[in-house]
Structures are given as C-alpha cells and as structure tokens.
C-alpha cells in the first residue's frame, strides 16, 4: 500500500483496461522487483458469453495498443511475458483466408488449416486442461484473430491522431511566431498568479508579511483556464505564487490550460519543500502532456548554510529530496 501511494496509484488518464502502468512505474521509479509466480492463478467472476468475451478482448487490445504507442517512453524497455504458443493459435485462420484469396484449392487450404490446428493442439496441451483443449483453441483462434485486427486498427488510428496533433501544434507555433514578430494581436506569454499561500518566510520576499492572509486571492481553475483560453495559442504559460504546489487543484489548472491554449512551455517556481505532493502533482501533469515542455524552477539561494539561513532550517535538504525524486520521472517522461 505504501508503494502504491508513493508512486501515484493508478493512472486514470491511461485507458488500457489493465493496470500495467503501475507495475512499470514501480520498477522504474523505485527498487521494487516484480516477480511473477508460474504457479499463480486468478479466478475472475465474470459471466462471459462468447460475444461479450470477444467484445472485451477487442476493446482491451485496441486500448492497450493505442496506449503503448501514445506513451512510448513509458513502455520503453518493458517486456510482457505471454506464452509464445498462445500467439500461434490464431495463425491458421489468416493463413487459410490468405490462401483462399490467392486462389488456392479449398481442400488444400483446409488441409493446411487443419494441420496447423492439430499442431496447436499438441503445443498447447499443457496450457489448457484436457477437457478444454479443443474448445480453448477454437475460442482463441477466433478471438485472437479479432485481437490482431483490433491492434492493427488501433495503430492506424493512432498515426492519424498523431499527424493531426503535429499539424495543430505547428499551426499554434506559427500563430505565436507571427504575433511575436509583428507585435500584433494577443500575447504569446501569460503569467498567472495562482496563490498567495506559502510555507516559507524568505528574508528577501517582498510580500512575506502578507502571505497566508484570510483571502489567499485564489481564482478557481475554471476562471484561470478560461482567461488563458481567451489568449488563444500560447508559447509560454507561467504560474506564480506563493508556492504553486500548495493548491490541491494544481494539476487540474495546468492540464486545463494545456488543453485550451496549447502552450509550448509551461513553467513555475517552487521551494521544493513538499516532496510527495510535488511529485504526485507533476506526475499527473506529465501523464496528460503529449506535446511541449513542463519546466520546474527550484529556488536555490546558495549552499546549504546560506540557503537555510534565508529560507529556514532543513529547506535545502527538502529541496534536494524533491529534486532527486522528480529527476526519476525523466526515466519515464524524458
């Protein structure tokens, strides 16, 4: 449970039907070792009919394929252990269809099909129980073939989405460059002050005496997102405070602005005090970030002694802990 909470739990934005993202993060962000026991079995209490089972497998395959292509850096270097003999089971069906399309004799094609099917029965006799050997092969023959088609379709759709994403991004950059060069129209950068709350009292802070007042001056996410949207495409969107990560809705603000005004760069300063909160908020942003950069500036006032003198005891140590933890995210989101 502690590990689950430490690395951010489940990724709600990753629609894969399965929780594979959690295991990948556990391996890449910590020293955790995932061990799969060959004797482990699980029983799902689902009342499947053939077509409901087929429908779920097709959806799972589509979503998993799309998610893997859409998050290549996350899945890079990972392997999924599936018995190679399972992958052979659907092969007789496409080979039969191809041979028929090429004009082969139906009896010859059927002979090839039955020969390959018989070979599958021999290879998979240790996978299926004796009573379900033939039925299991028939089901996976059909379902597996449909899963292949679903995976190919997901790949095709992904590249269409990717082309559209790059074209829209290019258009937004072009609009911003025209504005910047000719100094015309709406701004290409905006800075939004999202909170006056801060946990530190730095000596040089020009409004340290007014921090944490009863009215922190925090606009709701909807207002911040709407104002950014009204500026149109942005080159740079900056958040300011206070300590921005003190807002529980921080990731909602950033993700909303990214969706509505497509800034190429999103940046903010932090004192690095809240290690886990900063990590989880950053993770939620990166999980939704498909284009552009997300930049975090750490406020450092010198070596540990001088830094702590200005910002408070242990502030340098906490900053370093936060930096080290965020750096691990580069393994997943370079």
Please report, for each region that a protein language model flagged, where it lies by residue.
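Conserved strand-turn element in the central/C-terminal portion of the radical SAM core barrel
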Residues: 268, 323-334
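Conserved radical SAM core fold
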Residues: 244, 272-276, 298-313
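Conserved alpha-helical substructure of the radical SAM core
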Residues: 168-294
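Basic/Trp-rich segment in TM-proximal cytosolic loops or flexible interdomain/linker regions
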Residues: 50-108, 130
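Catalytic donor/gating beta->alpha subdomain of glycosyltransferases that bind UDP-sugars
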Residues: 11-16, 20-76
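Conserved nucleotide-sugar donor-binding
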Residues: 1-8
